[in-house]
Amino acid sequence: MAEPDIKSFERRMDGAVETLRKEFGGLRTGRASTTLLDPVYVDAYGSSSPLNQVATVGVPEPRLITVQVWDRSLVKAVEKAIREAGLGLNPQSDGQTLRVPIPELNQERRQELAKVAAKYAEQARVAVRNVRRDGMDMLKKLLKDGDISEDEQKTWADKVQALTDAHIKKIDEALATKEKEIMQV
């Protein structure tokens, strides 16, 4: 009797949840976070580089991010990249260090960010459901090929469904936490 590889489905579902957490990290709330600048790429040395490859990013205060640029010649490029990243941030140069104050979010922007968070969560739910569908298809194939009995197929299908439910619950909890964080004034 063949045994379905449920662990691979669990890893794929975990990956969807982890991707969601990373996307949530990039959403700006009223608080400073180093992950806020993850989507920033700097034109440096003839190519586009992630900010963390040309500078050290820190959070000395809850509403301030500091960017310590390693190469003085890149300070202007880093400042421009942060300003043009569409994050609504305005860095101020202080020698080789950039200070990036995190402005208060207005209610309209908070609601907009909550919608974006909900969209990310829905994408993660779809990814988890796709993994579930793949698992169910594999179980049907194993049943059709005679590798497992109908009872075994039902048992494994219940396990795949339980995994799906657990991961959807994690996604919903992460969304609720992020929405609360975004809406907090």
From Swiss-Prot:
Domain of life assignment: Bacteria
Keyword Protein biosynthesis: yes
Leader sequence segment: none
GO cellular component, one term: cytosol
UniProt keyword terms in alphabetical order: Cytoplasm, Protein biosynthesis
Single GO BP term: cytoplasmic translational termination
Predominant cellular place of this UniProt entry's protein: cytoplasm
InterPro entries, per database record: Ribosome_recyc_fac (IPR002661), Ribosome_recyc_fac_dom (IPR023584), RRF_sf (IPR036191)
Pfam families: RRF
GO MF annotation list: ribosomal large subunit binding
Family classification: Belongs to the RRF family.
Cited function: Responsible for the release of ribosomes from messenger RNA at the termination of protein biosynthesis. May increase the efficiency of translation by recycling ribosomes from one round of translation to another.
Protein name, per record: Ribosome-recycling factor
